[in-house]
Amino acid sequence: MLTHTPLSKSIRRLPQRCCGLLLALAVASCSLAPDYERPALAVPRQQGESVVATPAAVMPATLSADEETLLAELAPDGQLRRQVLLALGFNRDFQLAGLRVLEARALYGVSDADRSPTLNVGLERDRQHFDNAAADERYGQDLSVASLGVSDFELDFFGRVKNLSEAARHDYLATALGQQAARRALLIEIVRAYLLEQQAGARQADAQRIAEARQGLLRMAQEQQREGALSADDVALSRGEVLRAQRQLQAAIAEHSRAAQALALLSGYGTDWTAAPPVSLAPSTPGWLVDLPSQRLLERFDMRQSEELLKAANANVGAARAAFFPSIRLSTGIGVASDSLGHLLNAGSGAWLFSPQVTLPLLDGGRSQANLDLAEVRRQIAVANYRPFVKSPMS
């Protein structure tokens, strides 16, 4: 007769433990990092090929109303506007400036979040046992805890966290204004390159007309020589003028090619660009850009960027000074605790935590003073960088 031997509790729980272990290993093996893809590069497919054959990807770009007005006055045909849009979408430095803005905004969000308490929820199971019965009786534990509370929140009595948040905010504003300054600088550079290309094209067209005219005069001189009206020396002189005009034409073609290459480099070798008819002279400066009031000149993005950096430096000084005062941190929690999960929600299983902490630096090897000195020096550097921006628009 077969008898049924009951399995022990530890053996019956073995499948559950194995499943839990496998689940933990599966979660641990998951990777949240995105798949790596090598970025596309604006380089030729083979050595020796032209880089124009590999146009770079262009990011979408828009223009402000003032920029639209300026570009329309400088080039009514719209070619300059297309060049500026291509440059804003292609230029890697400008794209990097935009990413710096996003980085500074994220850092400001992190710093500003320190001013608010962080509410955490947790579930913990602690088990500790010993083979020695006496040690297990004294030090063994089997405890399950579920909690909801605030951990390590600093009570900002002396403004340290507030000043750090203000410094991060002004750094973010300065970075955003720096991006606008870089945008204006790029716009000015593309306008300059476009006008230089147009002027070079006009000089090439003039040189082409002169060379054709010299060639026509040479043919007339040769006909007159055959009729006996001109000597061979006169024909040789006319032929020398033709050679000189051809050399000037070749030089003008090379200059126009360099100017067009510089423009293409700025605009990312856009494939939808076609050369506009060259102009003989650069367009005149729009009237609304002449004799601007000084207050308008002080609104430049680079000047506003410098001012925001100055404000950030001042806030950093305040944070460095607050490091000399006590730092008060608070950890709180409320929840339930039991020696088993099954009794976790029973009556009488409540638990709470209140853990204030006051820290006053006594000996830090001069770190706090050095940080304060550093903040003061950086503030003075910001002042020194700001003053030239105030004077330069008026000069």
Tell what function each PLM region has.
Residues L2-C18, A24-G89, R169, I253-L298, ...:
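Terminal intrinsically disordered/low-complexity segments used for targeting and assembly
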Residues V161, H170, A176-L292:
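Periplasmic alpha-helical coiled-coil/stalk elements that build and connect Gram-negative outer-membrane
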Residues L32-P39, Q79-L86, F90, Q95-G98, ...:
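Small/polar-residue-enriched beta-strand and adjacent coil segments characteristic
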